[in-house]
């Protein structure tokens, strides 16, 4: 099946994270501060720490998060942060209590965020001649996928072309090479 791939080395890539580290951040929020701004700042800061080599842009949250905390109540809101030009969705879970008339929140990515440059790096570990093979896992640097989805990389070496299929295992971006 894999004409120029080393089957011996394929087992080394079976559960490797290629995602930007998923954001699982927490924050506390007092009743008289702007929750929307707090969350947007936290999203950008945490994303920059998780992926310092990627361009992280502006974060946006719904206007509803600008309401007084007491009127928001507990619940989940969808925010987004731009990474390499791609709008990456995040779920913000609000929990009331914990602070005087305030609350707390957690932020987690809603989809696996795959860095295709890292995926190319993993694919290069299973080809026999990584220096001469041309590997492409798509034009976009960042790809959003749900767990269970597949990502394909094309490997070209001389006249031979092969497709590698990776299965995304979870929101952390763990992938396995489908054989």
Q: What are the functions of these language-model segments?
A:
Residues 59-110:
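Acidic (E/D-rich), amphipathic helical modules within compact regulatory domains
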Residues 99-116, 173-179:
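A short, surface-exposed interaction/processing loop segment used at functional sites
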Residues 13-22:
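Bacterial N-terminal signal peptides
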Residues 31-61, 111-138:
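Short, non-transmembrane alpha-helical segments in secretory-pathway proteins
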Residues 56-78, 134-152:
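Serine/threonine-rich, repeat-prone extracellular segments and beta-strand-based repeat modules
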Residues 24-30:
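Sec/Tat signal peptide C-region and signal peptidase I cleavage site
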Residues 2-14:
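Bacterial N-terminal signal peptides that target proteins for export
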Residues 146-179:
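Extracellularly exposed regions in secreted/surface proteins, prominently low-complexity, repeat-rich
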């Amino acid at each position: 099946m894999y004409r120029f791939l080393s089957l011996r080395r394929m087992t080394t890539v079976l559960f490797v994270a290629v995602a930007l580290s998923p954001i699982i951040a927490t924050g506390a929020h007092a009743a008289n501060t702007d929750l929307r701004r707090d969350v947007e700042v936290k999203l950008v800061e945490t994303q920059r720490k998780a992926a310092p080599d990627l361009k992280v842009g502006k974060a946006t949250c719904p206007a509803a998060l600008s309401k007084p905390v007491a009127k928001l109540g507990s619940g989940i809101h969808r925010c987004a942060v731009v990474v390499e030009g791609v709008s990456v969705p995040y779920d913000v879970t609000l929990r009331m209590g914990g602070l005087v008339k305030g609350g707390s929140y957690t932020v987690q990515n809603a989809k696996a965020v795959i860095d295709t440059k890292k995926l190319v790096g993993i694919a290069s570990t299973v080809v026999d001649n990584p220096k001469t093979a041309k590997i492409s896992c798509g034009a976009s640097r960042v790809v959003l996928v749900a767990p269970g989805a597949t990502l394909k990389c094309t490997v070209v070496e001389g006249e031979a072309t092969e497709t590698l299929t990776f299965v995304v295992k979870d929101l952390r971006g763990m992938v396995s090479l489908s054989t």
